[in-house]
Regions:
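Bacterial N-terminal signal peptides that target proteins for export
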Residues: 4-17
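Solvent-exposed strand-loop boundary residues in beta-sheet-rich modules
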Residues: 62, 73-77, 111-113, 153, ...
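Short beta-strand/loop motifs in extracellular/secreted proteins, especially
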Residues: 65-68, 156-158, 249-252, 285, ...
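Recognizes extended acidic, P/S/T-rich segments that occur
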Residues: 68-96, 159-187, 252-280, 344-376
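Beta-strand-rich modules
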Residues: 92-111, 183-203, 276-297, 371-392
């Protein structure tokens, strides 16, 4: 038989056991509940970037059922779901080259009919831009040349670099917006190496650059010829001369042929002069001259310069209609000079010096002229030259004979 005291002890023991069991149950439940936490992405990287796509990869902490991938609009602050998947890699496609995009990944875990969502993990990624190809040299001059290349889709501009031999590295030349550029202030008959890359400015302001192109070599032409002129002119010959062009190996000389209607090469020269002989008086010719040099095993040329040249025309014979002049007025006559373009008439108050041009006759068949306003000198002297027009100047004959007359002023 259980005594009252024993009943009391038993009751206390039962209550204590119940309390212990309740505490254990609550502790076990709390421990279990604490383990069910939302998974979190700990790292997100752009594993591969292309011109129209970006492949992202990420790492996660915690148990995961799947992932939701979003694009994030920085202006509207809104997420747009792209895909739900279980893999930790995703390729975002149909993108624009050279642009920035914000991609977010949000993991989730499902348990007991509930979904535990992690935080959005955002990452700004960038598409690439194509490498420049198709570089060509469009023009070649002594101190500059023009390069052009295939236009890169999405490019906002291009960076150009050239190889500096002294610095032994590529240095910046400049930036252009179009797919061509002209490089100037270069050394003639030389080789220059270039690399070019495209760039775009993303919507977030970041500059995205392509890889540099393969090295491209361009050349400059031979130096341009200057000072091309005719000298030592006679009735049957003359000399063509010009200034020596730095870095030139030689010169090509051409003469226009009326028979073929084109220029024909008459000489390849190392010197800076060429004598023309065996001509008739007042015979005209047109010449072209250009320098050359050899660069990278290829012959390059300078600009072509043109010169019109002629031998002297025959000197005319003149006479006066009268040996007496009245009130500074005189009439001159002379013979027509074959192939001349006109005549210059000169007057002086001295027989051997001081002759000045008084009048030009611009017709070869006009062989008379009346001069007025000759002044009050007692004796006046007259000479004439025939001329041939060449380019912007003249080739004149020797002076004619000298005629004189007394000048009477009434």
């Amino acid at each position: 038989m259980i005594t009252l005291k024993e009943k009391r002890v038993f009751k206390k023991s039962a209550l204590l056991l119940a309390a212990i069991m309740t505490l254990f149950t609550l502790s076990a439940f709390s421990a279990f509940a604490a383990k069910i936490t939302a998974p979190q992405v700990t790292a997100l990287t752009a594993a591969k970037s292309m011109t129209d796509s970006v492949t992202i990869e990420w790492k996660v902490k915690g148990k995961v059922t799947g992932y939701r991938i979003y694009s994030y609009n920085t202006k509207t602050k809104k997420y747009t779901r792209l895909r739900t998947q279980k893999k930790t890699q995703y390729t975002v496609k149909d993108l624009t080259a050279g642009e920035s995009y914000v991609i977010a990944v949000r993991p989730y875990y499902e348990k007991g009919g509930k979904e535990y969502k992690g935080s959005y993990f955002k990452k700004t990624v960038y598409t690439t831009i194509d490498t420049v190809t198709g570089i060509k040299q469009k023009t070649t001059e002594a101190n500059r040349h023009k390069l052009a290349w295939t236009k890169v889709s999405g490019a906002d501009g291009y960076e150009v670099r050239y190889y500096d031999e002294n610095a032994a590295k590529y240095v910046d030349v400049g930036t252009v917006k179009t797919n061509s550029c002209t490089l100037s202030k270069l050394k003639s008959a030389s080789v220059y190496k270039y690399k070019i890359r495209a760039f775009s400015i993303a919507s977030n302001g970041k500059k995205i650059c392509s890889k540099f192109s393969s090295a491209f070599s361009a050349v400059t032409g031979a130096p341009d010829v200057t000072g091309f002129k005719q000298t030592s002119t006679g009735k049957n010959s003359y000399k063509l001369t010009w200034k020596a062009a730095e870095n030139a190996q030689g010169y090509y000389l051409f003469r226009y042929s009326n028979e073929t209607g084109d220029y024909e090469r008459i000489a390849i020269l190392n010197q800076t002069s060429y004598k023309v002989s065996g001509k008739q008086s007042a015979e005209r010719d047109t010449y072209q001259l250009r320098s050359y040099a050899t660069v990278k095993g290829k012959r390059v040329f300078g600009k072509t310069v043109t010169l019109e040249a002629a031998t002297k025309p025959e000197a005319p014979e003149i006479s006066l209609s009268s040996e007496l002049l009245y009130n500074g007025k005189a009439k001159l006559l002379w013979n027509e000079v074959e192939d001349a373009d006109g005549y210059f008439i000169y007057v002086s108050s001295k027989p051997d010096s001081g002759f000045t041009l008084k009048k030009e006759i611009s017709r070869s068949d006009l062989t008379t002229a009346t001069l007025t306003g000759l002044g009050k000198s007692k004796t006046l002297y007259f000479k004439i030259k025939a001329y041939v027009e060449v380019g912007d100047g003249y080739v004149t004959s020797d002076y004619s004979n000298t005629e004189s007359a007394l000048n009477f002023t009434l």
